[in-house]
Structures are given as structure tokens and as C-alpha cells.
């Protein structure tokens, strides 16, 4: 049994996430976690809310609440929506946890011991109107790289270029909108990433199986222009993890906090500590996932994220782990995604554009969204959500192919043999051909899932569903029943066993529908098939079943048009 550690990029606390966020990290991570559990492996799937930094402070101010209260409330909201989307986290933590405070300060202390942190006097934007320094996202302006007029002081969400606030053209305060800004001197700590450049370069070179998207972004930041730059890891903010050198105060850093992008990845580790505490387990139980000197040497660690998060996860976070000089588990595979666009433009949390997770669940159950998003995952290039494509995919794949198969075979069996698996007859050449095809397709499906090729996995699963429909069309048990009811019984028996097989194979994509199929077949046998022929005899003659309600309802043109109109603007 393999041990698989999975982390999804942790979502900002500042509101409910849109479908683009979901498909870029949490959803494919859940797909992989469910698949690995289904194969009998030991999985630790961790995620959390990212609660520090400017987004949290600004969102709390807008909501008229203290930031700690706002974060606690929104963590509950995000956890509930994640549960309703079927995201099977082993723990959904908080970057504001006591565990993350302690670990972040610990790493800073170790980096300082190893001469990998330097103190820098720098000039920073100060807002006279707001009476404070304006780091990062407190400043908006025009991106000097692409001209986007709503770029933030840390990164342009349009072109993904990392920025410093002083890089922005026509900067303004994100708090008050004031342009009465000036530059003043302040002191901050910098992580000396440049000192680790060669180690990071060699480490990335060793990851031959990483997606091109991941390695190309990492290499760009390592080698383009002046190469890998040192990164500021402190900020002048009220909310965050206080700057300390381990458990000791850090002279000159009073009143400052660690930069959100320093503490957020450390929360992956801290989250495991939160999990252990929540389940009454010892530290050894979480350390066996994260410390290679305490049992994590046999763990395979996989990360999922959007491409804008890649520089931090391939450079800054690894620099923190390597620079600590301690035996922490490093990522083995980093699966990154391009952007999902929305109807000709971008999804945007800050702009309220697109469909958000809570709104999606008001319209349709989670499995509809899970299937479309995963089958259209933006792996090799950006992809686009359109309502026409969503309707066509749901109606064809889920309703016509899978749902229709389940409905036809269960209803036919009930009408001719009753609600139990019929006996009699034997599998012949048609059935053997289907078994051979499904055997080949199952191995291909497993290969794509192991390689985290999300779209190809969805295509292969759909082909497995379609093979059942094609078999039914060809075998036509409803016709054969008139002349050879015994052999028709064998065909129906195979069809009912296919439903159980489909439930097991489909569970990573559409877990709720999978559970309904198993329930209809009145079985809890969800063992992954080793051999297709054996799997298609799992439900023996005489085994009772029920005809399920419609698995997936078709989306009407009227509904599609209504949703298209409803989500044409921005979220208020």
C-alpha cells in the first residue's frame, strides 16, 4: 500500500471562490485523492483557508467586522461549500492556527541561523490619507508589463507577473482610493533565495515527470533577466503571524508580521498538525507524513495549483524547506493548471465575474459541475466555460450516456425478470469482446489517473460508459427476450453488473451519483476491479436491486438561457 500526501493550493479567505479557482486546485486534487483511496492506498489530503495578508483585512473592513471574526466566519462558509462539492479533505485547516504561527516562526529562526535571511532598509509606499504603509494588495494601479489597470501591488492577475508596489503606474490606495501617496523608508526581512539558486535548479531538473507548464514557469523565474531574486518575507500589517526568530523576539521587527506568501505554504505542514490535534493523535502521527527522519521517506507528495501559484511553490517554499537544513518532505509532483475563462472573459473573485461555488450549487447538484470542470480542465492551455458547452456536455455525457444506460437496463430487468439479478444463460462472444475492450480501457484509465492527466481520464471514463451502451444496442436483450429469454437474462445480468462497475470507476469524478448507483444495486462492494470478468460477476443471480431515480436530468434550453442571463454581469 502506497502512502500519498496531497495538498491543494489554499484559497484566500476573502469570499467564496469561483469555478475557475475550484478546477485549478481543489477539484483535481480531490479527484486524485478519491482515486488513490479507491485503489487501497493510504491518503492524507490537506487544504486550508489562507487567512493573512491584505485580502483578509480589506474583506473584513468591507464586511464591517474584526478581521479575526471575519476569518472564522468565512472559514466555516468555505468548509461547508467544500463539503457540499464533495471535496474529501482529511482536514480543512486555517493558516491562522496556533500550529502555523509556531511553525512559521520556527522556519524563520532556522533560516536566520543558516544565514539565509537579511535585513533590508527599503522605500515603501505610505498613504497620508490612511495614515499607514501600503504593502502589496493595499495598492492598485496599472501593470507596467501588460497595461492591466487593476493590477495589485504583489502580482498582476491578468499577466501573472510578480510586482512590487512601487512598480505600478498611477498607484492608488485600495483602502481609500487616495492617490496622496509618498515613499518612506522602512525595514524588512528578505529570504536569500538567490543563495539557493543552484540547489533549486538541480532539484527542478530532477523532476522529469513534471508538467511542462510547471517547469517552464519555474525555470523562467530562475533564469530570466537577473535570475532568482531574494524575496521580502515581512510586511507592515496588523493581521498576521508576528515576526519572531523561533520563540525569540526579532529586534527591529516589532509590530511587523510575516508576508502571507511565506506563511501560507507552511500551513500545508501545520494543517497536518491541526488534523492530529483534532483527532486526538500524537505529533508522531503527522510527522510521519512530513519528516523524512520520522517515517515520511516512503511518502509520495503531490501538489495541485493554478499556474499563478507555481513560482512560490517551486522556488520560495522549497527554498524555505531546503534552507531550514531539516529533513522535511519535498514535493514529488507538482500538477499546475492554466486558467478557466468565463464566457469570453476572465473569472475574477475581486471583480465578482463568473459563477461562484455557492451559486453553482443553487442551480444544480455538485456532480454536474464536477464532471464538466474536470472533463474540461485547463491543463495544456486556458479553457473557457460557456453555458452552451456546459449544457451539451451534461446532456450528452451524463444524461444520454451514463444515465440512459442505468435507466434502460434496470427498467427492462424489472419489467421482464423483476427487481433481482436474473439467472440463466452464459456470456458469449459479444460479452467476451466487451470484457476485452473494458480491460484495455480500464488499464488506460488507471494510467491516465496515475499520471494526473485529468481530461484524458475523463475521456476514457466516458468511453467505458459508452461501451456499455454500445453493447446494449448490439445485444438488444429486449429483442432477444422474445426468442431466447435465458440468454437475454445473461445479457441483463452483465448490464446490472456494469452499473456496479461504473459506480466504482466513476466515484472520483461523480461521487454522489456513484453512491446512488451502488445504493440502487443494493451493494456496498466498492472494491476497485482487478479483473473485469470477475467484476462483471460480482452481483450474483438472485441479488436484489431497485430502479433508481433519474441520475442526471437534462438541462433545457430555457434553463440555460436563464442562467446565461443571470450570470452575465458581476456579483454584487
Swiss-Prot record:
Chain positions recorded as Zn(2+) binding sites: 143, 146, 156, 159
SUPFAM superfamilies assigned: Anticodon-binding domain of a subclass of class I aminoacyl-tRNA synthetases, Methionyl-tRNA synthetase (MetRS), Zn-domain, Nucleotidylyl transferase
Main EC class the enzyme belongs to: ligase
Subcellular location: Cytoplasm
Annotated motif 'HIGH' region, positions: 11-21
Superkingdom in the source lineage: Bacteria
Reactions performed catalytically: tRNA(Met) + L-methionine + ATP = L-methionyl-tRNA(Met) + AMP + diphosphate
Cross-referenced Pfam families: Anticodon_3, tRNA-synt_1g
Cofactor binding summary note: Binds 1 zinc ion per subunit.
Keyword tRNA-binding: no
UniProt GO BP: methionyl-tRNA aminoacylation
Documented EC number(s): 6.1.1.10
Amino acids binding ATP: 349
Gene Ontology CC annotations of this record: aminoacyl-tRNA synthetase multienzyme complex; cytosol
Principal cellular location given in the protein's record: cytoplasm
Keywords attached to this entry: Aminoacyl-tRNA synthetase, ATP-binding, Cytoplasm, Ligase, Metal-binding, Nucleotide-binding, Protein biosynthesis, Zinc
GO terms of molecular function: ATP binding; metal ion binding; methionine-tRNA ligase activity
HAMAP family xref list: Met_tRNA_synth_type1 (MF_00098)
The protein's role, per its UniProt record: Is required not only for elongation of protein synthesis but also for the initiation of all mRNA translation through initiator tRNA(fMet) aminoacylation.
Entry similarity comment: Belongs to the class-I aminoacyl-tRNA synthetase family. MetG type 1 subfamily.
NCBIfam families: metG
Annotated protein name in UniProt: Methionine--tRNA ligase
Organism annotation: Ruegeria pomeroyi (strain ATCC 700808 / DSM 15171 / DSS-3)
Amino acid at each position: 500500500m502506497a502512502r500519498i500526501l496531497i495538498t491543494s493550493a489554499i484559497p484566500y479567505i476573502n469570499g467564496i471562490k469561483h469555478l475557475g479557482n475550484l478546477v485549478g486546485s481543489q477539484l483535481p486534487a480531490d479527484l486524485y485523492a478519491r482515486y488513490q483511496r479507491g485503489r487501497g492506498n493510504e491518503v492524507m489530503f490537506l487544504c486550508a483557508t489562507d487567512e493573512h495578508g491584505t485580502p483578509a483585512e480589506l474583506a473584513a473592513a468591507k464586511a464591517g467586522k474584526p478581521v479575526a471574526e471575519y476569518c472564522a466566519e468565512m472559514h466555516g462558509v468555505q468548509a461547508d461549500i467544500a463539503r457540499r462539492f464533495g471535496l474529501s479533505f482529511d482536514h480543512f485547516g486555517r493558516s491562522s492556527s496556533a500550529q502555523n504561527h509556531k511553525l512559521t516562526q520556527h522556519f524563520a529562526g532556522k533560516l536566520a541561523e543558516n544565514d539565509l535571511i537579511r535585513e533590508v532598509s527599503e522605500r515603501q509606499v505610505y498613504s497620508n490619507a490612511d495614515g499607514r504603509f501600503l504593502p502589496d494588495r493595499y495598492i492598485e494601479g496599472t501593470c507596467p508589463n501588460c497595461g492591466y489597470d487593476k493590477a495589485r501591488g504583489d502580482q498582476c492577475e491578468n499577466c501573472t507577473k510578480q510586482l512590487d508596489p512601487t512598480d505600478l503606474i498611477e498607484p492608488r490606495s485600495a483602502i481609500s482610493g487616495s492617490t496622496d501617496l509618498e515613499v518612506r523608508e522602512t525595514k524588512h526581512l528578505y529570504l536569500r533565495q538567490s543563495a539557493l539558486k543552484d540547489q533549486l535548479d538541480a532539484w527542478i531538473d530532477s523532476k522529469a515527470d513534471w508538467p511542462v507548464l510547471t517547469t517552464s514557469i519555474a525555470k523562467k523565474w530562475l533564469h530570466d533577466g537577473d535570475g532568482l531574486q531574494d524575496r521580502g518575507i515581512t510586511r507592515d500589517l496588523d493581521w498576521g503571524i508576528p515576526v519572531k526568530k523561533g520563540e525569540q523576539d526579532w529586534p527591529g521587527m516589532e509590530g511587523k508580521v510575516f508576508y502571507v506568501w511565506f506563511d501560507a505554504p507552511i500551513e500545508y505542514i501545520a494543517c497536518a498538525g491541526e488534523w492530529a490535534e483534532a483527532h486526538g493523535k500524537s505529533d508522531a502521527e503527522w510527522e510521519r507524513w512530513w519528516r523524512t527522519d520520522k517515517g515520511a521517506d516512503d511518502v509520495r507528495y503531490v501538489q495541485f495549483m493554478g499556474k499563478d501559484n507555481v513560482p512560490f511553490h517551486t522556488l520560495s517554499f522549497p527554498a524555505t524547506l531546503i534552507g531550514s537544513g531539516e529533513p522535511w518532505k519535498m514535493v514529488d509532483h507538482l500538477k499546475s493548471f492554466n486558467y478557466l475563462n468565463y464566457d469570453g472573459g476572465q473569472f475574477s473573485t475581486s471583480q465578482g465575474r463568473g459563477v461562484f461555488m455557492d451559486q453553482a450549487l443553487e442551480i444544480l447538484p455538485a456532480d454536474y459541475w464536477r464532471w464538466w470542470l474536470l472533463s474540461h480542465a485547463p491543463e495544456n492551455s486556458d479553457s473557457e466555460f460557456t453555458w452552451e458547452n456546459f449544457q451539451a456536455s451534461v446532456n450528452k455525457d451524463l444524461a444520454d450516456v451514463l444515465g440512459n444506460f442505468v435507466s434502460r437496463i434496470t427498467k427492462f430487468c424489472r419489467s421482464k425478470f423483476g427487481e433481482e439479478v436474473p439467472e440463466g444463460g452464459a456470456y458469449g462472444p459479444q460479452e467476451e469482446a466487451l470484457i476485452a475492450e473494458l480491460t484495455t480501457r480500464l488499464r488506460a484509465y488507471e494510467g491516465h489517473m496515475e499520471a494526473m492527466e485529468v481530461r484524458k481520464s475523463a475521456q476514457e471514463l466516458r468511453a467505458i460508459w459508452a461501451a456499455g451502451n454500445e453493447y446494449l444496442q448490439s445485444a438488444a436483450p429486449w429483442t432477444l427476450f422474445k426468442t431466447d429469454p435465458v440468454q437475454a437474462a445473461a445479457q441483463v445480468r452483465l448490464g446490472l453488473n456494469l452499473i456496479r462497475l461504473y459506480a466504482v470507476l466513476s466515484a472520483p469524478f461523480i461521487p454522489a451519483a456513484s453512491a446512488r448507483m451502488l445504493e440502487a444495486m443494493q451493494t456496498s462492494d466498492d472494491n476497485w476491479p482487478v479483473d473485469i470478468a470477475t467484476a462483471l460477476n460480482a452481483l450474483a443471480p438472485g441479488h436484489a436491486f431497485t430502479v433508481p431515480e433519474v441520475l442526471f436530468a437534462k438541462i433545457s434550453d430555457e434553463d440555460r438561457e436563464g442562467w446565461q442571463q443571470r450570470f452575465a454581469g458581476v456579483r454584487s
